[in-house]
Amino acid sequence: LKGHPQAITPNIKKLSDSGTSFMKAYTNNPICGPSRSSFLSGIYPHNSLNFWQKPWYNNDVLANTKTIVEKFKENGYYVVGSGKILHHNKKELWSEFEHNSDLGPVAYKGKKEKGKIGISHPDIPKPFRTERMVGCCNMNGGQIDGSFGPLKNVENTKLDGEQLSWAYGGSRGYKEFKYTSEDERDLTPDEINAQWAEDKINELARSDNDSPFFLAVGFVRPHTPLIAPQKYFDMYPLEKIELANILENDMDDTFLNYVETNNVEKSEVGENNSTLTHKQPVSYTHLTLPTMIRV
């Protein structure tokens, strides 16, 4: 797909140059949960009717379907994994599973309390901090979809009179994520998984077990929250970013435009319908995905 001309991605380029890139690869669903369960089970969402973020193993069709992990395991593979692979994980599928998916680090306000979650990045203006839940998911603002900004020292920063800090995500119970500077900070969840994968590969190489293995590592980014070390933001000064070309009148035939210009009552399409509230883009650019395979 070539990517953005200003994107600095040496590792992806190295993988692409040494593997095969598929120019017409399409996601099975434009949100992560049903897309992952479809990809790893081989069952299309329109056959399973699993379109939303409910646990895939509670779906009648998928509950009676074996994932690729189970298939490998049944055929003598040692299957190990870590990170965000299936949106809702079942550890019993694996021979060994290390870290559950963690979307952190996230901003945290005040003292840690049971049931208390993170907040939007402190640089996000207050009007855009409001959370709006649709089913199980927040589709507007908040710690996940309402966060964009750099990791920075917030030791002396308060918001609404409360001290700010950084925290790992919910799977780690919002454990403190220590950050003083880029040279003095905890590892991000993706970095933890990368280190684990490297160690696991070396461990398997030294093992006397001759069985083949299947290893899956699920890196979170570029999934929201869009929080990363400052050095990555410094690579792209806002005043130098080239904006994408947009065709004239390109937005005139969208679903939301139809609703607004034709005065369609929201009740007709469902006030709480995920199609309307999430405004999940279903277009060519959102259904295509970069797919590279290296053997």
What do the PLM-derived regions correspond to, one by one?
Residues 1-287:
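Formylglycine-dependent sulfatase
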